[in-house]
Amino acid sequence: MGLTFFDKARELTEELEKTQAESIHQAAKLVADSIMNDGIIQAFGSGHSYAAAIEVCGRAGGLIPSKVIMDPAGGYYESIEGVGSLLTHRLQAKPNDIFFLISNSGRNPMGIELAEWIKSQGCKLIVVTALDASQTAASRHSSGKLLYEFADVILDNRSVQGDAALELEGLEGKVCGTSSFSAVLLLQQTIYEAVELMLEKGYTPPVYRSANIDGGYEYNFAIEDKFADRIFHL
């Protein structure tokens, strides 16, 4: 028995390297410009895409000026029009903030309404989505729009329709979604390149240290305090 998902992961990694390098460079520049101009990262993923949002917010090795946009319902109402607009009442944005919205299909109203609000605030938006699958999907929003249409930069996770990618004999459907794995690669490379760009420009960005190493918590807390009014939820 082989390690089939490992094989798929290697194949997907190579595909992302070949197809997404330029988009990653563009996204990294937007992130670097935001942080160097007193902006913060704000990231949202509904349902399972929340896992990708916390890859760029509040974790060791990530940028400290960052905040996850939390969906209190955990994605349960993401397909209902108007819920995303209600969520924006809890948000604040400054023009130099940079937003990540992560949605595999990009068809649900919640993400689309968040994107509309983000653009109305004059902010840049990076969308992580399965572009081919999204372009063939029908929007669930009355505008007929899909999430990728609002993006300044699209990071295409190259996932297939329905996300699950592997077939097994005797099983009608497929198993093993790939969108989380590919989102981690895309987002972490984006953050790496953003930090690299900032250092090249003589700007030392605030980066989280692990709270599980000695002094890490104290180091993080001292820097978080400078951004407390922007990165913490009330």
Swiss-Prot record:
CDD domains: SIS_RpiR. One of its GO terms (molecular function) is D-sedoheptulose 7-phosphate isomerase activity. Disulfide bonds: none annotated. It holds the Pfam family SIS_2. NCBIfam families: PRK02947.1. One of its GO terms (cellular component) is cytosol. Gene3D superfamilies: Glucose-6-phosphate isomerase like protein, domain 1 (3.40.50.10490). The lineage of its organism: Bacteria, Bacillati, Bacillota, Bacilli, Bacillales. GO terms for biological process: D-glycero-D-manno-heptose 7-phosphate biosynthetic process. This is UPF0309 protein lmo0025. Residues 31-205 form the SIS domain. InterPro entries: RpiR-like_SIS (IPR035472), SIS_dom (IPR001347), SIS_dom_sf (IPR046348), SIS_GmhA/DiaA_subfam (IPR050099), UPF0309 (IPR022951). Belongs to the UPF0309 family.
